[in-house]
Amino acid sequence: SKHMRKGVSPLDSEIQQLAGDILNHPRFQQLRDFQHHGESNSVYDHSVAVAEAAYAIARRMRLSGDETASVIRAALLHDFFGYDWRDERFRRYLRQYSGVGRLMRMHAFIHGHIAAARAKQTFGLTERECEAIARHMFPLAAMPRTRIAWIVTLADKAVASREMAAALGGYVSLACRKLFAYN
């Protein structure tokens, strides 16, 4: 696989202890196969990075053990949608709709709800954990209502911004080299 994380996850042992059932589950491992924010970034890579960031926030806020566990579990599963949104099948599905109907079915708007339902079915998450997953795309989704949901949302925004900057950085430097080449 061309994706960055291989073998044993470098996660903190406490995260491993609180979410080992998720990290080691075959359906979670399948997220390695879906490209996410850039060519060298998989949904698995992104989800683990969001969990690490969310864990750091939870520790800084001195959340209880139970709340910290919920933050980690929701963060790991916030993108547990289980499909490749770049795939032709998804594009075909979208082409049936137009206007606002198409817009509201786009990946950015729907994947939180799909991930929450899939996470609940696969891992039996709590309602608060599912809500954090469903609302992590605020402001494209409803506003988070709990600390857990806000932490997952903020961790996701921070990690996604870093990943997109890295992915776009290559294009920006290439464009600059072409633009300012002195030939």
Specify the residue positions occupied by each region the protein language model found:
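An active-site-proximal "capping" alpha-helix that borders the catalytic cofactor pocket
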Residues: A49-I57, F109-T122
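Histidine/acidic-rich helix-loop-helix segments that form or flank divalent-metal centers
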Residues: A75, K120, L125-C176
